[in-house]
Swiss-Prot record:
The modification N-acetylmethionine is found at M1. InterPro entries: Cyclophilin-like_dom_sf, Cyclophilin-type_PPIase, Cyclophilin-type_PPIase_CS, Cyclophilin-type_PPIase_dom. Belongs to the cyclophilin-type PPIase family. PPIase A subfamily. Binds cyclosporin A (CsA). CsA mediates some of its effects via an inhibitory action on PPIase. Its main location: cytoplasm. Acetylation at Lys-125 markedly inhibits catalysis of cis to trans isomerization. PPIA acetylation also antagonizes the immunosuppressive effects of cyclosporine by inhibiting the sequential steps of cyclosporine binding and calcineurin inhibition. Acetylation at Lys-125 favors the interaction with TARDBP. The modification N-acetylvaline is found at V2. There is a cross-link at K28, K82 (Glycyl lysine isopeptide (Lys-Gly) (interchain with G-Cter in SUMO2)). It comes from Cricetulus griseus. CDD domains: cyclophilin_ABH_like (cd01926). It comes from the Eukaryota. Residues 7-163 form the PPIase cyclophilin-type domain. This is Peptidyl-prolyl cis-trans isomerase A. GO terms for cellular component: cytoplasm; cytosol; extracellular region; midbody; nucleus.
Amino acid sequence: MVNPTVFFDISADGEPLGRVSFELFADKVPKTAENFRALSTGEKGFGYKGSSFHRIIPGFMCQGGDFTRHNGTGGRSIYGEKFEDENFILKHTGPGILSMANAGPNTNGSQFFICTAKTEWLDGKHVVFGKVKEGMNIVEAMERFGSRNGKTSKKITISDCGQL
């Protein structure tokens, strides 16, 4: 089985920054990968298109995926509001790792983050399910609009997304 690839076209205050593509590790975390894939295509009638990265901390990560409240308190999975931690096989080994944001054990919804550094303290707490395939330079460009408290200086949005 070939792991799926999805893309995000990223904008800053409506100006295109470029495309980031992700390999989703469906071979290791099929349920988590399928959630992200389906939210990227919007095939269930809801998903990431038009949503923003509400929290960007340079040297740490870019967090997005709250397409219901747009502030980090919302989002939902394709399985219902929340779903369980599938496993912690994969680790936060460095920049480009794609992992699920959560509010404690078994609270995965749609929020995710892209690591911009090694974040091993998140191992065993957040489910890693993919990695940046192409466009890490775009993630680095997004990072420049972040701050230490996570507030962004420009609105960083997913203007388009889907499966490749």
